[in-house]
Amino acid sequence: MTNESAHNTPTVKLACDLIAQPSVTPEDAHCQRMMIERLEAIGFKVENLRFGDVDNFWAIRGESGPILAFAGHTDVVPTGDLGKWATDPFTPTIKDGMLYGRGAADMKGSLAAMITACESFIAAHPNHTGRIAFLITSDEEGPAINGTVKVVEWLEARNEKIKWCLVGEPSSTTLVGDVIKNGRRGSLGAELIVKGVQGHVAYPHLAVNPIHMIAPALAEMASETWDNGNEFFPPTSFQVSNFNSGTGATNVVPGEANVVFNFRFSTELTADILKQRTHAILDKHNVNYDLKWNLSGEPFLTAEGELVAASVAAIKKITGRDTELSTAGGTSDGRFIAPTGAQVLELGPVNATIHQINECVSVDDLNTLSDIYCTMLTELLA
């Protein structure tokens, strides 16, 4: 394929159309309408699902059999300083084989590849086995309260079960398809308020310093071996992301300290075990505290099975390379789908520029990704 023809494929054209919509979370900016029009044209039945201020849709083709669902999001993160962009982030621009624009890699390029893969597959296999579905939201980059999690609840209420789920998050590191995510660590966040007694620094016996109170406990938590990981997951990590205390004055012992921390944890632990061990450390150090927890998602793992095999085979067939299975990185909406029993994988373009100024993706990679998705459909449903 020549450079010029690579730029004019249905995948790249659709990616450009989607990028041109300023769908900063939770706005969809008509991206879903564009996708729905393409899907209805090839026989999908679509149900629009609006929860709160969030647009979602569920589209399905086929009457019976196992469901292969493509999952993704139309919302993007804010652009940041527009003056630092080489091009307008919502004016898709191709330069030196790279497509620039907010959402190019995360994840409008994947959405375009999913649509065109289905168009190609259905043209070749109009009477395919099983069912193909799309679960699309505009609330992945934001609170993720009225998006995928609500659609999953809606599906469960109808007893609609996804067997295989392909999430289009940008999983690749250097070359498209070099890494697929077959699981993710859990994420447990906490907001800790340490209660002291405010006073004058010259009269410490009349004050209780919350910074001094919490410091030994935080040191122990930071040095603690929470687990040793396993063959699929690295060891659980503990990180303090925010620490605030003090009045701004140099002669006042603060009365309170606020600490925000996070665990990224493996399948060796549960959120409840982490909570218990945290409370035990705080209590051992006689910390006076309030603690609020936020579980963003439990860890999940898709072991060897049909979906892993299909993705590995498709990547090998289209690119000639062997892929790496990984559970590294942050959370995704796969965390809401995996607990239903579905096999979940993340496979998308290179993630080197996601959320950055001048976000971009290779146009060749988008075309390759569409071919990989189409081959996976053939492996599972032809």
Curated annotation (Swiss-Prot):
Its EC number is 3.5.1.18. The keyword Transmembrane helix does not apply. Binds 2 Zn(2+) or Co(2+) ions per subunit. Zn(2+) 1 binds at H73, D106, E169. InterPro entries: ArgE/DapE_CS (IPR001261), Bact_exopeptidase_dim_dom (IPR036264), DapE_proteobac (IPR005941), Peptidase_M20 (IPR002933), Peptidase_M20_dimer (IPR011650), Peptidase_M20A (IPR050072). GO terms for molecular function: acetylornithine deacetylase activity; cobalt ion binding; succinyl-diaminopimelate desuccinylase activity; zinc ion binding. Pfam families: M20_dimer, Peptidase_M20. The active site is at D75, E140 (proton acceptor). It comes from the Bacteria. The keyword Kinase does not apply. Keywords: Amino-acid biosynthesis, Cobalt, Diaminopimelate biosynthesis, Hydrolase, Lysine biosynthesis, Metal-binding, Zinc. One of its GO terms (biological process) is lysine biosynthetic process via diaminopimelate. Its cofactor is Zn(2+); Co(2+). CDD domains: M20_DapE_proteobac (cd03891). Transmembrane segments: none annotated. It catalyses: N-succinyl-(2S,6S)-2,6-diaminopimelate + H2O = (2S,6S)-2,6-diaminopimelate + succinate. Zn(2+) 2 binds at D106, E141, H355. Homodimer. Catalyzes the hydrolysis of N-succinyl-L,L-diaminopimelic acid (SDAP), forming succinate and LL-2,6-diaminopimelate (DAP), an intermediate involved in the bacterial biosynthesis of lysine and meso-diaminopimelic acid, an essential component of bacterial cell walls. Belongs to the peptidase M20A family. DapE subfamily. This is Succinyl-diaminopimelate desuccinylase. It comes from Saccharophagus degradans (strain 2-40 / ATCC 43961 / DSM 17024). The lineage of its organism: Bacteria, Pseudomonadati, Pseudomonadota, Gammaproteobacteria, Cellvibrionales. The gene is dapE.
